[in-house]
């Protein structure tokens, strides 16, 4: 199952140093039956975009609670076995899931991160005009430099 983990630069740096996301369980976002019903579509691309957007909103909340980390949203896309994902949807969060296991780096598919120029807007809570940029896994260490 493709999951979207909300993160920050600090969380991403720790995952890279530790070889993955080791402090399970995690709140993540995914294409769920509840998300399908809420959006009324079976378009996988649209559903994945919505799940990633929900993770980006959660990343912004994490940033608000972590003023010492760079003000750039981070969403990590990963493939995990269905058996480690539990439903955690709510009316206001139809894509939310709970990941009950560690997510090793080998399961990470990509990361989606705000451009550095977006940081002032992100810090001020104005994220709606900023799309996340896609980064391949081999680019992640350079992203943090």
Where are these regions (language model features)?
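Long, hydrophobic N-terminal alpha-helical segment
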Residues: 1-44
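Short, low-complexity, polar/charged sequence segments that are solvent-exposed and flexible
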Residues: 22-26, 48, 94-98
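Generic structural hydrophobic/aromatic packing signal, biased to beta-strands
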Residues: 28, 55, 74-78
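Short, structured active-site "lid" loops
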Residues: 43-58
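Glycine-rich, aromatic-bearing surface loops/beta-hairpins
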Residues: 67-74, 78-145
């Amino acid at each position: 199952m493709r999951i979207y983990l909300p993160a920050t630069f600090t969380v991403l740096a720790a995952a890279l140093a530790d070889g993955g996301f080791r402090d399970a369980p995690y709140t993540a976002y995914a294409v769920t039956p509840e998300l399908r019903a809420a959006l009324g579509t079976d378009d996988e691309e649209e559903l994945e975009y919505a799940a990633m957007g929900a993770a980006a909103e959660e990343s912004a909340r994490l940033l608000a609670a972590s003023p010492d980390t760079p003000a750039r949203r981070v969403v990590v896309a990963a493939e995990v076995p269905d058996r480690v994902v539990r439903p955690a949807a709510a009316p206001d969060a139809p894509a939310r899931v709970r990941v009950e296991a560690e997510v090793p780096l080998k399961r990470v598919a990509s990361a989606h991160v705000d451009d550095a120029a977006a940081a002032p807007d992100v810090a001020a809570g104005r994220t709606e005009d900023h799309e996340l940029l896609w980064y391949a896994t081999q680019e992640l260490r350079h992203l943090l430099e």
